[in-house]
Amino acid sequence: NFASKGSNILDNTNNIKSRIINDFSFNFNDKIFENIGLRNNFGIYFKNLNSLGKNDEKYKSSPQLELQSLLELRSDLPLIKLTENTSHTLIPKFSLRFNPSDMKDHSGDERRINTDNVFDLNRFGIDDSFESGYSATVGIDYNTKNLSEESYLELKLATVIRDSEESKIPTKTSLNKKNSNLFGSMDYKISKLINIDYDFAIDNNYDKFEYNSFG
């Protein structure tokens, strides 16, 4: 796949950022190990950043051409149990990522990580860099449904482990650390009229909540 976009931004009358970003991706089809049901997917991603800045901290005043790459292996193991009135699904999953190149400094960016975006390739919402370093994202999804009453319970947990701290990753996400927060969520539909959503993050010492919210 190929995608390209560009921008020319003027801030504070004298700060200029010009960029053209080209993204290439190659994904190999899932390989299913039928004996155990393990699904694997391997992706190779390339980013070509052409940039020029004036009075800007991230981009130099002379034209720059940068090439970045990212390798990712995703695996999950769906486990399903069915009864007459209920279904139970348990999915352990992980993502291994490696970026041999550096990234732009986004340490001060505002970004909240949760169970909905922690496995996203661009989980920081940035377009000029891939996430730097080695990381392993580990998670588990559980879902149970009552087929006759249309009620269900969904639970998700995930965390990120890396080999060393990364100074340019948004610090408020905690993913810059060797061990990130533990992210979790619950979606509980008691009936057609009552539904409870709960999201939370526990710090990497597991002794306090970084955030929690009910929806």
Label for each model-derived stretch:
Residues 1-215:
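Outer-membrane beta-barrel proteins and related beta-barrel translocases across Gram-negative bacteria
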